[in-house]
Every structure is written in C-alpha cells, then in structure tokens.
C-alpha cells in the first residue's frame, strides 16, 4: 500500500488503467488489430452469417444435386455463374465474363446457382433468357418472404422444394435428417453442414400449351444419397 506521505512513488493501481485508456485512445502502439480484409464478415447476405465476405459468393453446389437434375432433365449445356474450379459443364460464364451481360443461347439447358448476396438481378436475367426456349434450373435459398422469390415462383414451370428426410423404426420412433444442403466452401473446398436456410430449385422455362405449374417436395436423401450415411437424429415433439 502506498504511504500517503510519499509524493515520489507512482501507484499503478490508480494510474495504470487511465494510462492504458489514453494510450489506446491516442492511437498508440498497443492497438487492437483490424480484421484482415479477407476475413471480414459484414452479414450483408443473411443475418447471422459467419462466412467472410471475400468467399461468401464462392460456394459450390454439391455434385449430387447436379447428378439428380441431369438424370431428371438431361445434361447441362451452360453453367451461367461459375468458375473453372466449380463449373458443372464445359461451357460456363465466370465473374469476369458476366452472364448478366450475355445472351445464353437458344434451346439450352442451363444451370444457375447465383451469388446469394444479390439474387434479384439473376432471377430477372433467368426470366429474360428462358424466353429463348431455354430451361434454366436455378438453386436459391428457400426464403419466400423476399420479392425475388415471389418473382421466380410466378415465372417457374416447376418448383422443387428440398425437404428433410423422415423415417420411423418398427417401434414407432421417428428419425430425421436435415433437408439443408451442405454446400462446398470456397475457402476450404470441403462440404459444410449448418446451412442457415433450406433450398429450393426453380425450373425456369415457358409452359407448354395446356401445361400448369408443378410443385414437388423431394426428400434430401433422394437428391443427395450420401446424406443417408449421416446419422439421423431422434425426432422429439414433446
């Protein structure tokens, strides 16, 4: 304890905290490091996202989704928003070649998994390009509270909702596997669970005469069979 008759000694308990605050406030040496630009997380895409901005739009589609859709509708002629590393067919448009400024052709089967930070403009482009007798299979978050979702739904020939997988054992116990896709990280190249939304696929093409829009509800295990290898969780509803 400091002797109050001692006017020479400095008591750090009294002055240290204010010294530290002043040093930091003045921009001194001991400053908190800024987050590297490549790691910044703004949350502009969805509230609660933990994905750095630099790779937020670089997620790749699980290849089982592509295999399912090609088995159902035929091979793809064009990947409208891809890179050399994650393209699903030989012809693709990258960020540099920009599908938004191009004609996608005629009578083509097109895959589109657009950047989720700005889906509106890609939905409008798909609607424009399907008028050339193209079919555009567009994967989007299952967020029907948005204007772009409504616009896609209004113009789609088919809508595929990817659902959870539910099973029941002989004793009546229910088990579930999440219907949320595990996208491939642009940062690590590995599939990542914990997607914060479900997914929906809009089949964008003009309806034939007499045809009406169809809506399908497909369990994730029918689209991505490897999900069956994941342990199902007991479903408790009480």
Swiss-Prot record:
Catalytic activity: a 2'-deoxyadenosine in DNA + S-adenosyl-L-methionine = an N(6)-methyl-2'-deoxyadenosine in DNA + S-adenosyl-L-homocysteine + H(+)
GO molecular function, one term: site-specific DNA-methyltransferase (adenine-specific) activity
Disulfide-bond pairs as recorded: none
Name of the top EC class for this enzyme: transferase
Reported pH dependence: Optimum pH is 6.9.
Thermoactivity: Optimum temperature is between 40 and 43 degrees Celsius.
Keyword terms, alphabetized: Host-virus interaction, Inhibition of host innate immune response by virus, Methyltransferase, Restriction-modification system evasion by virus, S-adenosyl-L-methionine, Transferase, Viral immunoevasion
Family stated for the protein in its record: Belongs to the N(4)/N(6)-methyltransferase family.
UniProt protein name: DNA N-6-adenine-methyltransferase
Organism of provenance: Escherichia phage T1 (Bacteriophage T1)
Gene that produces this protein: M.T1
